């Protein structure tokens, strides 16, 4: 794949022979933004798990202290009082049968989905549409609940969901390039802590194998996966 001049210039700023501290990586991410507007900052983690095994599926949520820089659009499947509570909490789309039909017909203009337990029998038919996009409501992530107001508020304030893919990778948005370096590191730390907490007991060998920080259209920045404490320090380790 041929890269543009801006990308090549940004890539030259990254030393591929070293592992950066989280603070240095965030600083570099801001410097390597090739877009004219603030870009999304993402962290990719390669985990030492086998996602084919049910007991090694890493999935969870984390409340980022500084949010993602984007106000997510939340869709809620609910009726009656729960529907009103969802609207009052700021949900962007609220409904039941008609809304389920809209999604089944291709409506996907939202970033998160919440559902009340009584509607999951009907929402289940959307599994093939929502599942691959990581949008299917799940009790483990707090998105199947009767407390829809709290679920909506959590998502709007920076709660993100993550799930390991078939290649044992996790991808999480941790902010934008107009965040301060400290804000990005603190969001990264919150995500890292939760991923480490969810290490499956059956996982063998090194759990956190590789960490890369990147921006939209920007180069990957290798981060020292052994740095799990004192993340605001400057030191780096040799690759």
Curated annotation (Swiss-Prot):
InterPro entries: Ribosom_uL1_bac-type, Ribosomal_uL1, Ribosomal_uL1-like, Ribosomal_uL1/biogenesis, Ribosomal_uL1_3-a/b-sand, Ribosomal_uL1_CS. GO terms for molecular function: rRNA binding; structural constituent of ribosome; tRNA binding. Coiled coil: none annotated. PROSITE patterns: RIBOSOMAL_L1. SUPFAM superfamilies: Ribosomal protein L1. The keyword Ribosomal protein applies. GO terms for cellular component: large ribosomal subunit. GO terms for biological process: regulation of translation; translation. Keywords: Repressor, Ribonucleoprotein, Ribosomal protein, RNA-binding, rRNA-binding, Translation regulation, tRNA-binding. Part of the 50S ribosomal subunit. Binds directly to 23S rRNA. The L1 stalk is quite mobile in the ribosome, and is involved in E site tRNA release. Protein L1 is also a translational repressor protein, it controls the translation of the L11 operon by binding to its mRNA. NCBIfam families: rplA_bact (TIGR01169). Belongs to the universal ribosomal protein uL1 family. This is Large ribosomal subunit protein uL1. The gene is rplA.
